[in-house]
Amino acid sequence: MATTNQLIRKGRKVLKEKSGVPALQACPQRRGVCTRVYTTTPKKPNSAMRKVCRVRLTSGYEVSSYIGGEGHNLQEHSVVLIRGGRVKDLPGVRYHTVRGALDCAGVKDRKQGRSKYGAKKPKA
C-alpha cells in the first residue's frame, strides 16, 4: 500500500485496456484475402468440424477467421470482410467473416436471423 507522500510524488499508474481484436486497428471491419480455407475441431467438451479461413488483412496482419452458417463458397484468394468476435471453443480464432459481403455469399434458405448471415428476405 502506498503512503500519502508516495502518491503525491508519483501518483497511481493508469492501466491500459488491451484490445481483443488488435488486427482491426480500431476499425469496425477489415478487408482481406483468404490464404487458406480449412476445418478444425473445437476444444474438449464439444465435437464438430468448424469452418475457418486464414486471412491476410489490408492492415498487414494474418489472422484466423470463423465462417458462420451452413455451407460457404470461400476458397483461396477469395476477398472477405472480417469483424471482431471470438469463437470460444476454437483457440486463436478471434474474428468472424461477414456473410453476404464481398466474395462471401450469404447462407442459402435462411429464414430466421437472416441479417447475421447475409440472407435476403424470401419472396412470399
UniProtKB/Swiss-Prot annotation:
Q: How does it assemble?
A: Part of the 30S ribosomal subunit. Contacts proteins S8 and S17. May interact with IF1 in the 30S initiation complex.
Organism domain of life: Bacteria
What are the recorded Gene Ontology BP terms?
A: translation
| Biological function | With S4 and S5 plays an important role in translational accuracy. Interacts with and stabilizes bases of the 16S rRNA that are involved in tRNA selection in the A site and with the mRNA backbone. Located at the interface of the 30S and 50S subunits, it traverses the body of the 30S subunit contacting proteins on the other side and probably holding the rRNA structure together. The combined cluster of proteins S8, S12 and S17 appears to hold together the shoulder and platform of the 30S subunit.
Q: What organism is the protein native to?
A: Psychrobacter sp. (strain PRwf-1)
Q: Which family does it belong to?
A: Belongs to the universal ribosomal protein uS12 family.
A molecular function (GO) held by this record is: structural constituent of ribosome
Q: Which HAMAP family match?
A: Ribosomal_uS12_B
A Pfam family annotated for this UniProt entry: Ribosom_S12_S23
Protein name (Swiss-Prot/TrEMBL) = Small ribosomal subunit protein uS12
Which keywords does the record carry? Methylation, Ribonucleoprotein, Ribosomal protein, RNA-binding, rRNA-binding, tRNA-binding
Instruction: Provide GO CC annotations from the record.
Output: small ribosomal subunit
Where in this protein does the record say 3-methylthioaspartic acid is found? 89
